[in-house]
């Protein structure tokens, strides 16, 4: 038995084949998840979010003098809705985070970042603080964005989780445990 078949017009690319055969349909962000704000008077700002907005502090990093370097605050059962970092300039945005379903969705977001040549900052990786999985990247205007999945469920009666400044690298980037200058200094 023998048959001749015409080659399909749609074929798998064999030279530099893409990860995905079909164009991806976006990162599938479920919602805006959180933001990290940099500014002067972090202690006062943290207190303002707690007293005026009604947020609770779920986690923090202490400076050697015992003051707070950065705090993760929540008004829900998420590990954080906003984080506040003590910085030498007022009113800066470090990043906006988008909520994704799970670690697999973070991988899909990484595929999209690679496919479209999006400026990657860090990741995929995982946070020690909040326990979330993440990728940081830049939008076309230069603003840092994050995809975020997972994290623990915050309960109002749980004790404050805290870190010291010597271990903040592990808290932010659990796998390699190192912060880089660009991650700390590039703000909008």
Describe the function of each predicted region.
Residues 16-20, 26-29, 45, 53-55, ...:
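Catalytic cores of nucleotide-enabled group-transfer and carboxylate-activating enzymes in metabolic
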Residues 37-79:
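Core segments of cupin and vicinal oxygen chelate
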Residues 45-50, 113, 137, 142:
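Conserved active-site tyrosine of GNAT-family acetyltransferases
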Residues 3, 60, 78, 87-88:
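A conserved beta-strand-loop-helix scaffold within acyl/acetyltransferase catalytic domains
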Residues 63-65, 88-90, 126-130:
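A short beta-turn/loop motif at secondary-structure boundaries
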Residues 82-84:
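Conserved beta-strand in the GNAT
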Residues 1-28, 31-40, 71-72, 89-188:
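Vicinal oxygen chelate
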